[in-house]
Amino acid sequence: MAEMELWFTEQQTPDLGFTCKITKTIYTAKTKYQDLAILETKQFGKMLVLDGAVQTTIVDEFCYHELIAHVPLFTHPNPKKVAVIGGGDGGVIREILKHEEVEKAYLIEIDQEVIEASKKYLPEISCALDDKRAEVIITDGIKFVSENKNMFDVIIVDSTDPVGPAVGLFESNFYQAVYECLKEDGLFVAQTESPFYDQDLIRNVFHSIKSIFPITRLYLGFIPTYPSGLWSFTMGSKKYDPLEIDTSKIKRIDTRYYNPELHKALFALPTFVQKIIE
């Protein structure tokens, strides 16, 4: 008798699914906030899934984590205090702590079970969460940002998709609170979904940020397991422009995706993406 195959499908739009073969269900839980699963896949290794959406995989996580962390941290000349909103898997913290000038990196995560599961089953990604420079705070990111003023050099919003607990992280009043939470020369980056499937969201977020921050930039990266593969990030900066940095300093850290030549290329947008944010 043939062995039964198990497949996982993420419904990425109402009309499109992303499907991969599962060799093992490592862990599942219903947390206070979401359904959590860690699956072993044939193609992408271990995969973290929240509410049916792929968050990260062992094979392609470096693409996302390097792009969301290093672009802002190399844009700011001296990022000593950094906060990550969301990102309970710990991948962004791992990348942040490659920067020696960072004195403290705070992980602000609403769902403690995501952190615990990542520490137990995804050590390759969560390995820096016990670093002495990292501090984990279990609270709502919106609440944390609105209660702290003039505190951080860089804030990274590593949110889930704009459903469930993350909805408020894509709204204008949140970006205003981020502005106030940053120091006078601070900057922030948020993941802002796919230019193929989320054009209205990208447009709205870009213009919300642009109305608050003097410098607003959109950049793109490739993450194979994310909807369409093409992914956007939006930066709001009070002072520093990512297009004007000395990219030679990027060589000092160990990366697999991001490099000096790529930095400026990330901001070269296809015409259809330029039109989204006009």
UniProtKB/Swiss-Prot annotation:
List of catalytic residues: D158 (proton acceptor)
Segments forming domain PABS: 5-238
Q: What is its EC number?
A: 2.5.1.16
This protein is called Polyamine aminopropyltransferase
Q: Name one GO biological process term.
A: spermidine biosynthetic process
Does the keyword Transport feature in the UniProt annotation? Answer: no
CDD domains the UniProt entry points to: AdoMet_MTases
Q: Which gene encodes it?
A: speE
Q: Quick one: which residues bind S-methyl-5'-thioadenosine?
A: Q34, E109, D140, G141, P165
